[in-house]
Amino acid sequence: MSMQDPIADMLTRIRNGQAANKVAVTMPSSKLKVAIANVLKEEGFIEDFKIEGGTKPVLELVLKYFQGNAVVESIQRISRPGLRIYKKKDELPKVMAGLGIAVVSTSKGVMTDRAARQAGLGGEIICYVA
């Protein structure tokens, strides 16, 4: 059976892994998932990630905790296959008044809402992370 929304699956694996205090979570890899993982690492929401190759590459995310609590308080899918959400550069949302991030897919790649605003780019709002 094929997966309908692989990005939602990725976010759910992160959410469930942190709820169960797992060190790392694994999932099938794709270019978009790697780009999202890179943004999460740059923003300090995950420790690290690596791709274990082969014919079916696997993405492993090393989860991050602070004083025993998960760093990711909430992670929420916004644009989904049945309802895509696009925003212009001046309409990009501020998550938790700037404390969280919105992951945005732009014409220049996947980046945070802050980076997209600085670059003057709009795009598809993939998810909110706080």
UniProtKB/Swiss-Prot annotation:
Protein species of origin: Buchnera aphidicola subsp. Acyrthosiphon kondoi
GO cellular component, one term: ribonucleoprotein complex
Any one of the GO BP annotations: translation
Pfam families: Ribosomal_S8
Subunit: Part of the 30S ribosomal subunit. Contacts proteins S5 and S12.
NCBIfam families assigned to the protein according to its UniProt record, in alphabetical order: PRK00136.1
Biological function: One of the primary rRNA binding proteins, it binds directly to 16S rRNA central domain where it helps coordinate assembly of the platform of the 30S subunit.
Family classification: Belongs to the universal ribosomal protein uS8 family.
GO MF terms, alphabetically ordered: rRNA binding; structural constituent of ribosome
Encoding gene, per UniProt annotation: rpsH
Family matches, as SUPFAM superfamilies: Ribosomal protein S8
Protein's name according to its UniProt entry: Small ribosomal subunit protein uS8
InterPro entries: Ribosomal_uS8, Ribosomal_uS8_CS, Ribosomal_uS8_sf
Keywords: Ribonucleoprotein, Ribosomal protein, RNA-binding, rRNA-binding
Stored PROSITE patterns: RIBOSOMAL_S8
